[in-house]
Amino acid sequence: RPMTGTGMGYLNANPNEYHITMDYHLDDMKEAFYSLVKMSDGLTECYRPGTFDRWKQSFRYLQEMNPRFIYVWGGGFGYGPKCFGGSYDILGQAHAGLASVTGFHDYVGGHATKHSNWCIDWYSGTQITFGILAAIHWRRKTGLGTMIEFSQVQAATRCLGYAAPLYGRFGIVRQRWGNWDTQLCAHGIILCGKSDFPDAKNPQDRLEARYAMISAFQDEDWKELCAITGMKDLYDKYKSHKERVEAEAQIEIYAALEKWAEDKSRSEVVKVCQDAGLLAEPVCNDREYYENEHWRTRGTVRWMDDPTFGDVLQHGSYSAGLLSKTPRRLFWIWRPVGADNVKIYHELLGYPTSKIEEWYDKAWI
């Protein structure tokens, strides 16, 4: 709820959604739940396995009420020996292998790292949505709904790229490689010596605006990079991509690039590279992203007048891309829990307001 405890992390997580409260254990609430099921396309739940079945609202019960119903269990580990394990984003990143390949190699003092964002929560939602679209396609052909079983933890393995095939084929466990690329070189992020905003009050600007991305893995680009940075000895040593993509070579190459950049700002490094025809960009923070003319022109980051919270800077629904015929719509950034009880219970399901007031008095909603 605004000002009473709902965390800022909820912003942008559930735009355009109605929010109600419901106690499934009560008969009156169960009746309302079943009424929603009969008129809905489906639901997604992530309770421990068997919970909804005990409450007589699992797929086997709901499909009898609505044969077209699409039911998603977004379980933690999914069915199997650990099906009763809980589900948290950090658990998925850790247990499914993602954290082990995130961060710098221990050669430079790195360690396994959790992604700052809740990427597994977001990625799980994306994969579940894809499954729902497939279920809708199936329903159009057959007229029937289906149940989708999903493991949130295993969603992280889809972020690991070639890690599993690499181990299966060669027995090699993929390592952390930080801001470099295991398949391309030079193709990474380097630390520059000076900040673009040395006098800024915000430490994110003053201290962190020192990183630049440089890409020069093609032989001609690599030659040009070595020329403008004075690394002729490295060009002679690593003329072919096969030579410079090796781990030992990358360690030497990126150390030399950061040595070259130690008396330069991020902007200076990017300009030198871009003037030479190379791909280079600064690593931007949120403020710079917001101020970027490109994104503002596209309209993918914009201000909105949220009906509950007022002016909010957001990108939800607009950042998905530009659609040729379907307009992008964002009606609200989020809603307080229970904000739409009257709309759903009274306007949609037809319960009298006196009944809803009674539920409030009894603390049922």
Question: How should each PLM-predicted stretch be described?
Answer:
Residues L98, S124-Q127, I148-T157, F217:
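NAD(P)-dependent dehydrogenases' Rossmann-like dinucleotide-binding region
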Residues A112-Y123, M147, G178, C185-H187, ...:
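A short glycine-threonine-serine/GTX helix/turn-capping micro-motif
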Residues R1-L144, P336, V342-I365:
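N-terminal helix-loop segment corresponding to the beta1-alpha1 unit
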Residues A186-A276, A280:
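Aromatic-enriched alpha-helical interface/lid elements that frame and gate functional surfaces
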Residues W180-C185, L191-D196, D205-R206, E288-I365:
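Terminal low-complexity tails and localization/encapsulation signals of metabolic enzymes
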Residues A135-N179, D286:
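Substrate-binding/catalytic subdomain of NAD(P)-dependent oxidoreductase enzymes
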Residues G76-Y79, Q152-R158, K194-D196, A216-D221, ...:
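Glycine-rich beta-alpha junction loops
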Residues R1, D89, L166-Q175, T229, ...:
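Short, surface-exposed loop/helix-turn segments at secondary-structure junctions
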